[in-house]
Amino acid sequence: MLKLIRQSLPKPLKKVLSNIKKRTYDNWKKKLFFKRMQLKHIALLKKLKDKDKIKVVFLVLHKSVWKVDPLFKKMLEDPQFEPLILVCPYTSISLEGTRQDMMDVYKYFNEKGYPVISAYTAKGRRWRELSELGTDIVFFTNPYKLTKSLYYEEAYKNYLCCYVPYYFMATTHTGELSSQLNTLMLNSMWRIYWPHQYVFEQFSRHSVANGKNSKLTGYPATEVFLQSGHLKEQTKKAWKTQKSKKRKIIYAPHHTIENNDSSLSTFLQYGNFIRQLSNEYQDRVQWSFKPHPILKEKLCAHPDWGDKRTNEYYQYWRENPNTQLDLGGYDDLFNESDALIHDCSSFIVEYSFTKKPALYLLNPKNRSESFLNEFGKKIFENYKKAECKKDIVSFVDDIFNEKESQLSNKNSFFESYLDELYIKSTPSQKIIDDIKSEITH
């Protein structure tokens, strides 16, 4: 009967009732859940007081959104921690795609020499339980339900869980903050480490946790771009060897190819054009195609693209002498590059750390810059933007002619942001210090 009544209600009334439910009943449930989790966390912390080593399990679905590398390295060097990467299934794709993804992610971390295991044990033909790993603390690298419940709800309901955002949170494309920042998952976290003041304050405002479970630390993923002396010794060659010296440009398209107001991607407008440019400038410029990890599956499902056309496009970048396909980490790729052309969210801020020129491809629906939040707008003030193909060609020509000084994205707000959160202490060190202070308190 209730189902029939709901179906017969007018859409405007349904929306009003849904909003009332969110503000009352749903919020009441979240508050109760948050209080229960606080008590759970207190009990779990007590169990850690006398432990010599803390087992920290990092749940990873995609290698390209691994934004805690400096933190993981610090834990490896610290005798108080035993960090481990657990490769979890990305369940939004086919079984074969999931299997291949997990193999790729495992290989990526194994080649880095990191302790890593697969969530699936072939010998036992089952999915591993977190309890059998001796887990004390869990780090989430993604806030969404994209994997099995074992590595999502069952994890955040039963362990001391931490979260570092998988992107810099400078845009609004993922939805209203009132709903994005008030999920059960975020409210259940023992600790959330936010990259900047704006989102830290917004979480305090919108979540039933009122920000009590969060800290402002800065973004661990970008520490590497501020350690230039160290990088000169450590950096491996991320780019293909060329017969002659060429400028290095990254093309990084976002996955939101849907034709709606929240879309950032301009791939359908410029993807083929930039491929043509890579061919026209082959004697002068080498290119990296650095797509969002979800772009390929969306292109395969697109009526104008499909599997064959998508695979051919990716193959072009992988196989040509002056082009390459990069699907994993990008620290070295960024550091060795000369410029970035993109329409991504997080890269707006992340690439700013390199102090190199970047061109943002504006989606026709977002030319008012309404896709940026207050933090993003301040970072974006001096950004170079492209509204047409001519703007892209002009930027590439300037990079080839080494006119970087004319393309500077220098920003006083960004410099102040660096001074506040990165100079005295790094984000990863703040996170380590915070965890230690809590487990020894």
Q: Can you name each region flagged by the protein language model?
A:
Residues 1-52:
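Membrane-proximal basic amphipathic "stem/tether" segments
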Residues 46-57, 80-81, 157-159, 243-247:
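A short, charged/proline- and glycine-enriched loop
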Residues 210, 305, 346-419:
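Catalytic binding pocket for nucleotide-activated donors in carbohydrate/polymer assembly enzymes
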Residues 57-226:
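Active-site and donor-binding regions of nucleotide-sugar-utilizing enzymes
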Residues 29-43, 165, 181-263:
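A nucleotide-sugar donor-handling region in carbohydrate enzymes
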Residues 67-71, 76-77, 220-310, 388, ...:
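Conserved catalytic-core segment of nucleotide-activated headgroup transferases in glycan assembly
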Residues 116-122, 322-327, 381-395:
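Short acidic-hydrophobic, aromatic-tinged amphipathic segments that line or gate anion-handling sites
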Residues 121, 302-349:
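Donor nucleotide-activated moiety binding/catalytic core segment of transferases
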